[in-house]
From Swiss-Prot:
GO terms for biological process: proteolysis. It comes from the Archaea. The gene is tri. This is Tricorn protease. Its EC number is 3.4.21.-. The lineage of its organism: Archaea, Methanobacteriati, Thermoplasmatota, Thermoplasmata, Thermoplasmatales. Optimum temperature is 65 degrees Celsius. The record marks 966 as: Transition state stabilizer. Part of the Tricorn proteolytic complex. Assembles to form a hexameric toroid, 20 copies of which may then assemble to form an icosahedral supermolecule of 14.6 MDa.
């Protein structure tokens, strides 16, 4: 029996009185720190100097005195502090601060312990993610200068290099040692930690990007001294030994070696949590573990927990703007709408004057009209999703006990008798709204059945059924099935030879409409010889009663027979297209004398792929009588239709929700969702978010048996840390460690809402600067292809190369020893500014140029073009060069940009170093497999190869440890298919794919490894190992220092050698 919960009578809230009193009380209460109710905290990133310890707690920086036991907060309100290091003299502290809602930028500050001054040092807005920390403290040189590691001036975000900071950030001197995370000094020698960042989200990592340690030898070269089979992180030096964290024995422990990488010793035997964040004052080592701080004395091998005590318990309420976290919305009867925000459901009128919260604790996912004065909703727990009913007239709620799995789509029939839900078990089912009893209609073998509709007479359910004709088919198709509630029988509405979708019934339930990719008409590619099917969707209609006329054809009634009975047998034979040109259609809504079609114009995928930009749709109206199509609304991202088919609710690209009557679309109104602030408990939210993160991992990890064993073992272990979490970043630390227990790639946390501090901004002009006396000089200006958009420093637009020019001022503000150029540029990002340049011989230039927000792409294209020129010159015009930065849209762009020219050289280098992965490697492999077998011989002009997109001669691919995911797959495929030699270093080793489908209540995206990649010969072995090259060529720190690229040099030499024995046959015109 369903459990019945009564919440008493319903009270509508007068919005004006509520909002004023809530905000007034909140402002007063928020300032009050509840010291009497302090709870233990999560303590992170400690460092030590003498008797002073610093650490991060509640996003702020604290200091603890080991002698007195006193603790005080020393830096707060900067953003989220996640790292801090004492300078060697202990007078200053370098602090890393992350900003932006999802902590997507980071910069460094100095804190002066003598006078309390806080000063921003870097203006790089370095990339920041939960899995790697860019623009961070790398170490200190023997003179006490800070050395940072940053990706800010590099062509790749995964390439962090070392810079010495001079004059409090006025000057940054590159060390030119290549990728590095840490730098230490021992006996006057530099010790480099490459990739020695933390990997809490991937415990047990063994791939090519695992941390390694190099040391400088007497010759000025570097040698690798620590290269274990597992990851190495947080290196520090005490005496003549290097200490670090690794889990070579299966669990994270502190190990050490001597300065030659020998005499490996294990110092700890932890079994609860991994140690993290090693730091030292040269005598003792400090670290955090399980939210507490410990001190390790290498001389005595003793470990002590530092008892700091309870510090801070911020007020356990968070107030949010509902529209910022809106997840689901739905029209109800009359002027009422329902929507879900931050896991809570609300019913309100359009104006927002009256707002009613559905009285169900977190977490609600969907809410739909459930009949007169009722809504049906899906709410989730860590066990699964459940159905509930709420009567907003009486205030009574009913929650059913049947676990529906993880629900990803929900609908309710117009009469409020049953709901239809689709879950991740690939089931579509009905749920009786009286008893809560679920009945499975059908289960797919291939995918979720989320594309469904219910007829207005509540008799039929039509849905898109995913299918493949064989277990190893490459494509999942979709056919329309119809379930008859009266006969409890399934009927095929379409054949199984295409992708049929978006079924919809008309108001009298006599006709079934749907969309289909059946109108194939290829469009030519404008860059290479290729075609694509861009506008293939067309609407179709099926009369459900045999003998009934097509409702979109104006057949006189006198010429048609009387309507008979429903007969769904062989209904696919009655399908006919509607007279609308093909397009990219997503939804169809039949009305009495017209049809609404939701269409998305053809567009590029770049913004959607990299920025998550929603597709902008257009609502079209097809008039059956005139057969004309008109535009109703544009810039839409989502759409809902009311039960009576009279009102439409839409979300637009501005993120707001609007409603309008179909009879008068111009009478559009904004749904005012933000008049009532959303109030929630931080503690309750964090527990729910942890539970959901744990459940997502349990239910989506690709190996079900392994997921069950791990999930049950770790649940309580990490949930015990959640009460210590007082900020969202605290919780993030717990969640990523929990995910890391699966020891598999692609376990990420992305996005979310961590702080209200705006992201750091940076201003760029695609130039490097160096300080010459009191002035900045342009050390290098970057450009790729000067004719391409966005590929050169804006200074080049004036026809001068600014290299060597002195920068006197920017908009009249002198920059140099007394004024940081990076600060000045950051304040002008996105605008134009006048820059005064001074060259040799008194040459002065005043230039108005655009200050860029980012210049990485320019630096990337400059790097590619420099490599291409080098390859062409060194091979004397016989070898071409292509770099592929990822296997996404940018990777496709860069491949085709160069392939059409570079493939015609006798040899070809395909460089996938630093490849960020994606999914298009197979498209690129397909092109590289094309070998020339003939030529077209014109009377005039030159030869044209056949196939047109084909490789002329020999190929070599270069890969490295930063090539991962689909970059791993490309590297293995290139090698396996024998396309040429693969050289470089072992790849990242992450090939269990992801398709994130759910967000946490604050917008956080969590990914779970769902699709394990298997190769012939390698099996599942590429995961957590990588791909070994045919020839290993290391790129050592001293190679970067000397300006050499040994991997490209080897590739050129190897291709030249192969071409010695390559005989090319070209056509000779007959006489």
């Amino acid at each position: 029996m369903p459990s019945l919960m009564s919440f008493g009578s319903c009270q509508w809230i007068d919005q004006g009185r509520f909002s004023r009193s809530l905000y007034r009380n909140f402002k007063t209460f928020k300032l009050h720190e509840m010291h009497g109710l302090c709870m233990p905290n999560l303590l992170l990133n400690p460092d030590i100097h003498g008797d002073r310890i610093i650490f991060v707690c509640c996003d702020d920086l604290w200091e603890h005195d080991l002698k007195s036991g006193s603790t005080r907060k020393i830096v707060s309100n900067l953003g989220v502090i996640n790292n801090a290091r004492f300078f060697p003299d202990g007078r200053k502290i370098a602090i890393r601060v992350m900003r932006g809602s999802s902590l997507n930028t980071a910069d460094l500050y100095f804190y002066n312990g003598e006078n309390g001054e806080i000063k921003r040092i870097t203006y790089f807005s370095g990339k920041s993610t939960g899995r790697r920390m860019f623009t961070d403290v790398a170490g200190f040189d023997p003179d006490g200068n800070l050395i940072i590691s940053t990706d800010a001036m590099q062509p790749f975000s995964s390439m962090t290099c070392l810079y010495r900071v001079e004059n409090d950030g006025i000057n940054f001197v590159p060390l030119n040692l290549g990728p590095a995370t840490h730098i230490l000094f021992a006996d006057g020698r530099r010790v480099i930690g490459r990739n020695t960042f933390e990997l809490p989200h991937w415990k047990g990592y063994r791939g090519g990007t695992r941390g390694k340690i190099w040391i400088e030898v007497n010759s000025g070269a570097f040698k690798k001294i620590v290269d274990m089979s597992t990851h190495v992180s947080s290196p520090v030096i005490v005496g003549h030994r290097i200490y670090f964290i690794t889990d070579i024995d299966g669990f994270g422990q502190i190990y050490s070696t001597d300065l030659d990488g020998k005499d490996l010793r294990k110092h700890t035997s932890f079994t609860d949590y991994y140690p993290r964040h090693l730091n030292t004052d040269g005598r003792r080592i400090l670290f955090s573990k399980g939210g507490s701080i410990y001190i390790f004395n290498p001389d005595t091998e003793k470990i002590e927990k530092i008892e700091i005590g309870d510090l801070e318990s911020p007020e356990d309420r968070i107030i949010s703007i509902p529209s910022k976290f809106a997840e689901d919305f739905s029209p109800l009867d009359g002027d009422l709408i329902a929507f879900v925000s931050r896991g809570q459901a609300f019913i309100q009128d359009v104006s927002g004057t009256y707002v009613l919260k559905v009285p169900e604790p977190l977490r609600i996912r969907y809410v739909r009209r459930g009949g007169d004065t009722k809504v049906a909703f899906i709410h989730g727990t860590r066990e699964g999703d459940f159905l509930g009913i709420y009567d907003y007239r009486t205030g009574k709620a009913e929650k059913f006990e049947e676990n529906l799995g993880n629900v990803f789509a929900m609908g309710v029939d117009r009469n409020g008798k049953f709901a239809v839900v689709a879950n991740d078990r690939f089931e579509i089912m009905t749920v009786d709204l009286e008893t809560g009893k679920p009945t499975v209609i059908e289960r797919s073998r291939e995918a979720m059945i989320t594309d469904f509709t219910i007829s207005d007479n509540s008799r039929f359910i039509a849905y898109g059924f995913p299918l493949k004709h064989g277990e190893t088919d490459g494509y999942v198709m979709q056919a329309i099935h119809v379930y008859d509630m009266e006969g409890r029988k399934i009927f095929a509405a379409t054949t199984e030879n295409s992708h049929d979708y978006a079924p919809a019934f008309d108001a009298d339930s006599k006709n079934l409409y749907y969309l289909s990719y059946r109108s194939l008409d290829p469009s030519p590619d404008r860059v290479v010889l290729n075609f694509s099917f861009e506008v293939v969707s067309k609407p179709f209609v099926i009369p459900l009663i045999p003998g009934s006329p097509n409702p979109t054809k104006l057949v006189p009634r006198s010429m048609t027979s009387e309507a008979g009975e429903y007969d769904l047998n062989d209904m696919y034979k009655r399908s006919s297209p509607i007279n609308v040109d093909p397009g990219d259609y997503r939804m169809i809504i039949p009305l009495e004398s017209s049809i609404l079609i939701y269409s998305v114009p053809v567009h590029g995928e770049f913004a959607a792929y990299y920025q998550g930009a929603p597709e902008k749709g257009v609502l079209l109206k097809y008039d059956v009588k005139t057969r004309k199509v008109t535009e109703v609304k544009n810039n839409l991202t989502d759409l809902r239709l009311s039960a009576d088919r009279k009102t439409v609710m839409v979300r637009k690209d501005d993120g707001k929700i609007y409603t309008f009557p179909l009879e008068k679309p111009e009478d559009e109104r904004t749904v005012e969702t933000d008049k009532r602030p959303l109030v929630s408990s931080i503690h309750e939210e964090f527990l729910q978010m942890y539970d959901e993160a744990w459940k997502l991992a349990r239910d989506n990890y690709w190996n079900e048996a392994v997921a069950k064993e791990i999930s049950e073992r770790i649940y309580e272990k990490y949930r015990n840390l959640v009460p210590l979490c007082k900020t969202r970043y605290d919780l993030s630390n717990v969640i990523v460690e929990m995910q890391g227990e699966y020891r598999t790639s692609h376990s990420y946390e992305m996005g979310g809402t961590f702080t209200d501090k705006d992201p750091f901004r940076s201003g760029r002009i695609a130039c490097d600067f160096k300080l010459d006396g009191d002035h900045y000089v342009v050390a290098k200006a970057y450009a790729g292809d000067y004719s391409n958009e966005g590929e050169k420093s804006p200074i080049f637009e004036y026809g001068i190369d600014p290299t060597g020019y002195l920068i006197e001022d920017i908009d009249g503000e002198t920059v140099g020893a007394g004024s940081n150029i990076y600060r000045v540029l950051s304040e002008k990002a996105g605008t134009s500014a006048r820059i005064r340049l001074s060259g040799k011989g008194g040459d002065k230039r005043d230039l108005m140029i655009d200050i860029l927000d980012d210049d990485r792409f320019i630096r990337y294209r400059s790097w590619v073009e420099a490599n291409r020129r080098y390859v062409h010159e060194r091979s004397k015009g016989t070898i071409g060069y292509i770099h592929i930065p990822d296997m996404g849209m940018m990777g496709l762009n860069e491949f085709y940009r160069l392939f059409i020219n570079e493939s015609s050289y006798q040899g070809l280098i395909v460089d996938v170093r630093f490849n960020g992965g994606g999914f298009v490697s197979q498209l690129i492999i397909e092109k590289l497999m094309n070998k020339r077998i003939g030529y077209d011989n014109p009377r005039r002009g030159t030869l044209s190869p056949y196939p047109t997109n084909s490789v002329r001669g020999k190929i070599i691919a270069i890969t490295n440890e930063y090539a991962g995911s689909d970059g791993d797959i490309f590297s293995f495929s290139f090698k396996k298919l024998g396309l040429g030699k693969l050289i470089g270093t072992r790849t990242w080793g992450g090939v269990v794919g992801i398709t994130p489908k759910r967000r946490l209540i604050d917008g956080t995206v969590l990914t779970q490894p769902e699709f394990a990649f298997w190769f012939r010969d390698a099996g599942f072995g590429v995961e957590n190992y990588g791909v070994d090259p045919d020839v290993e060529i290391e790129y050592a720190p001293h190679d970067y220092l000397s300006g050499k690229d040994p991997q490209i040099d080897y590739a050129i030499d190897a291709l030249i050698e192969e071409l010695r024995n390559w005989n090319e046959e070209l056509p000779q015109r007959p006489s």
